[in-house]
């Protein structure tokens, strides 16, 4: 009987992943990472629901105290990023350094198996042509989470199973009801676990970053207003700027050195290219020449045509230049740019600078 360790957050998706694998005859072991204290999908409430699920399914449940790991890799990462005037993407960082990597390591060394599973909506397939594991979009494009998984390497992909990748969210809910899981009607998490625990990103950051009032200026340096901290803003932001103007204003740049927020019209926030660092080529080997693909510069952004120009062929950690077919709005350094060939996730990296 194949043994698999299932990451359990206490939500309906991971619950169905565990239950469905057991239905298929797998020896299932539940594993919950204790990431932080307080309310939230991956916090104390989730631990209780995960424990209840394992009792209902009659499977072992392991809890790993990952609070220090989460603090060092995610909280520090976020705080340092916002202090530098960038907008970090914690989910992809968390998936690789806090969740998948440590989970697979724990499974191999403590539970004698080399297979883990989660409730993510994505798919993995091995390509004989490329001689590597490929990451694919989920069947349910509205729930597809492959964007947040672009940084997983071949070792992690080879040991991971996504039971929900071929299902829609509606089907998952139906399966939860049919399996009589107590999480079947549990509301879906709407925000980052940090936001759920603290109410807002601003509230969370204010615990770690001292507020320093500064100026809100236009691109000519004219003072239009004042702010209470650069870390309260992100590029592309329109609401909550606090400046009255005859036309809509957007945050187009942040200057933490001068403690300034620069605003302008929407056209100013449109960019034709950007640089990407810490590139991870997932489904193909790092190309030597420019390639064409479709890219997402935000999780919910519409994919757009792009030319990817390698600047450093070595992976991971290489750099590329992205040249967009259509100008992109609100590109924020620190966020991820992820490129696809139809449903195949080719690679991705961290947006570094734009022009």
UniProtKB/Swiss-Prot annotation:
Matches recorded under InterPro entries: MnmA-like (IPR004506), MnmA-like_C (IPR046885), MnmA-like_central (IPR046884), MnmA-like_central_sf (IPR023382), Rossmann-like_a/b/a_fold (IPR014729)
Region Interaction with tRNA, residue ranges: 143-145, 298-299
Annotated active site: 94, 193
EC annotation from Swiss-Prot or TrEMBL: 2.8.1.13
Record's subcellular location: Cytoplasm
Gene Ontology MF, one: tRNA binding
Disulfide partners: 94-193
Top-rank lineage group of the source organism: Bacteria
Reaction(s) this enzyme catalyzes, per UniProt: S-sulfanyl-L-cysteinyl-[protein] + uridine(34) in tRNA + AH2 + ATP = 2-thiouridine(34) in tRNA + L-cysteinyl-[protein] + A + AMP + diphosphate + H(+)
Keyword Membrane: no
Any GO CC annotation of this UniProt entry: cytoplasm
Enzyme class: transferase
Matching Pfam families: tRNA_Me_trans, tRNA_Me_trans_C, tRNA_Me_trans_M
Keyword Secreted: no
Site-annotated residues for Interaction with tRNA: 120, 335
Keywords assigned by UniProt, alphabetized: ATP-binding, Cytoplasm, Disulfide bond, Nucleotide-binding, RNA-binding, Transferase, tRNA processing, tRNA-binding
Function: Catalyzes the 2-thiolation of uridine at the wobble position (U34) of tRNA, leading to the formation of s(2)U34.
HAMAP family: tRNA_thiouridyl_MnmA (MF_00144)
Family stated for the protein in its record: Belongs to the MnmA/TRMU family.
Name of the protein: tRNA-specific 2-thiouridylase MnmA
Organism name: Acaryochloris marina (strain MBIC 11017)
Lineage: Bacteria, Bacillati, Cyanobacteriota, Cyanophyceae, Acaryochloridales
């Amino acid at each position: 009987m194949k043994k698999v360790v299932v990451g359990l957050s206490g939500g309906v998706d991971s619950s169905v992943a565990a239950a469905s694998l057991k239905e298929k005859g797998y020896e299932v072991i539940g594993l919950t990472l204790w990431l932080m204290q307080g309310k939230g999908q991956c916090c104390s409430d989730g631990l209780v629901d995960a424990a209840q699920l394992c009792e209902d399914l009659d499977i072992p449940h392991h809890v790993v105290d990952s609070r220090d790991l989460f603090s060092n890799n995610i909280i520090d990462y976020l705080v340092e990023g916002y202090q530098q005037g960038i907008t970090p993407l914690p989910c992809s960082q968390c998936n690789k350094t806090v969740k998948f990597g440590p989970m697979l390591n724990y499974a191999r060394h403590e539970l004698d198996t080399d297979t883990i599973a989660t409730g993510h909506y994505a798919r993995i397939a091995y390509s004989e042509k490329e001689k590597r594991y490929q990451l694919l979009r989920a069947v349910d494009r509205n729930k597809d989470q492959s964007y947040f998984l672009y940084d997983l390497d071949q070792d992690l992909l080879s040991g991971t199973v996504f039971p929900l990748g071929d299902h829609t969210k509606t089907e998952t809910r139906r399966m939860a009801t049919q399996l009589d899981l107590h999480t079947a009607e549990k509301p879906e998490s709407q925000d980052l676990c940090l936001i759920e625990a603290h109410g807002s990103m601003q509230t969370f950051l204010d615990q770690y970053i001292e507020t320093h009032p500064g100026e809100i200026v236009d691109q000519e340096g004219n003072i239009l207003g004042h702010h209470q901290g650069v870390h309260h803003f992100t590029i592309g932001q329109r609401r909550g700027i606090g400046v009255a103007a005859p036309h809509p204003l957007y945050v187009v740049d942040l200057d933490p050195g001068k403690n300034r927020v620069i605003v302008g019209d929407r056209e100013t926030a449109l960019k034709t290219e950007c640089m990407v660092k810490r590139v991870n080529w997932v489904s193909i080997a790092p190309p030597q020449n420019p390639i064409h693909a479709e890219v997402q510069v935000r999780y919910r952004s519409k994919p757009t045509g792009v030319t990817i120009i390698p600047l450093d062929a070595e992976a991971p950690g290489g750099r590329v230049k992205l040249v967009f077919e259509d100008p992109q709005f609100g590109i924020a350094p620190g966020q991820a740019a992820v490129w696809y060939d139809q449903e195949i996730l080719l690679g991705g990296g961290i947006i570094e600078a734009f022009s």
